[in-house]
Amino acid sequence: MKSSTTIITAYFDIGRGDWTANKGFREKLARSVDVYFSYFERLGALENEMIIFTSPDLKPRVEAIRNGKPTTVIVIDIKKKFRYIRSRIEKIQKDESFTNRLEPRQLKNPEYWSPEYVLVCNLKAYFVNKAINMGLVKTPLVAWIDFGYCRKPNVTRGLKIWDFPFDESKMHLFTIKKGLTVTSQQQAFDFMIGNHVYIIGGAIVGSQHKWKEFYKLVLES
């Protein structure tokens, strides 16, 4: 059986292994490269076609876990390629007009102080569309799944191939909290800056065409 869904993911070491409590970081924030790869072993066990973006030094580890399964690894020097965008993010994070809008409890979250963290989180739709535009996706559906999404074995439930007949006319997002009623675009932005999380960013599914539409909306926001 061949899945109708190609999985795309990415991993770059942004130094999260050093974000330990004894260095003043929030509890349980640290996550080393080895921990991320232990999570990826579960996702990487799936026999779906996968396209994985990473740095040159980590490519062999990715390929070893995939162990011959249908895989394309694309290496990127993320610091060099996105140097300008990273500097823009850092400038915003240090701007008082931004920090003054934040609740004090949020200041320890990496969304508000780590430009590298914000950068990689915002490149998901970029990576998917990059793979599509390169002609690497051969399936009707494409899923972005975070590299470290499968923290526990029960996430994949022993599946060898992940396949589901998602509606190709829609983008499929998944919620972790009920009760969201969007009344305006401004409300959505207020929820973003306040870190009110309703939608999982770690798993998104859509057709190739819908991903292109989605990417345009991401760029506009």
Give residue ranges: language-model regions.
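N-terminal anchoring/stem segment of glycosyltransferases
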Residues: M1-Y112, E116-L119, L123, A131-V137
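Conserved catalytic core of nucleotide-sugar-dependent glycosyltransferases
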Residues: Y149-E220
